[in-house]
Amino acid sequence: MVTEGKDSKVALEQSWLELLYPEFKEAYMQELSSFLKSEINEGKKIYPKGNEMFLSMNSTPFHKVKVVIIGQDPYHGPGQAHGLCFSVPKDVKIPPSLENIYKELEEDLGIPKPKNGCLLTWASQGVLLLNSVLSVEKGRAGSHALKGWERFTDKIISKINEKDCVVFMLWGQYAAKKAYSVDTSKHLILKSAHPSPLSSHKGFFGNRHFSKCNEFLNSKGISPIKWEIL
């Protein structure tokens, strides 16, 4: 799942591959790969599909990253996860957290609620939609936590931290802790409650992160994100 092809090349976009290839040689990634293969061999259903585990990076090359949104782990229901945090394929019902994200988007920028939950439009503009854990067993939220993904995605964040003027949109305590080492002197850190129905009224609604993000990007001479979903 981590590598593919007869030469065991990592199925990863070139700019990310150049940065992260050494990680795939580390023992923890070898152990993670063995774990995933073992789970599949035991007949367990793993989400997202293997070719979508790295969709966040494959959709948003390193040099294009302007914004980072951090999730915890993929949706564990059939057909939901496709490699982008909070996002689902176009033909899948919009999950509750994403419904609330859309509500805030409309309140903040006046953008009508999109008809689908696919966030590839954001990803293609430089919004890295990164889950901390990149796989999950069907029906078992958090089942692939502490298997190595967190260390891998920590490395991704550390590489992005080397860039300048990136916006980190951190929703909930988990995301805030994940990005604790980000250099606040050159990046914009936006924190609020998580958009889950359990916490959205505790500070997510009204956070105006979408407009604040674009205000920052504009101030740095960086083209803003068009948040409309196509």
Give residue spans per PLM region.
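A polyanion-binding, active-site-adjacent surface
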Residues: 22-170, 174-177, 182-183, 188-191, ...
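Generic N-terminal amphipathic, Lys/Arg-enriched alpha-helix
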Residues: 7-20
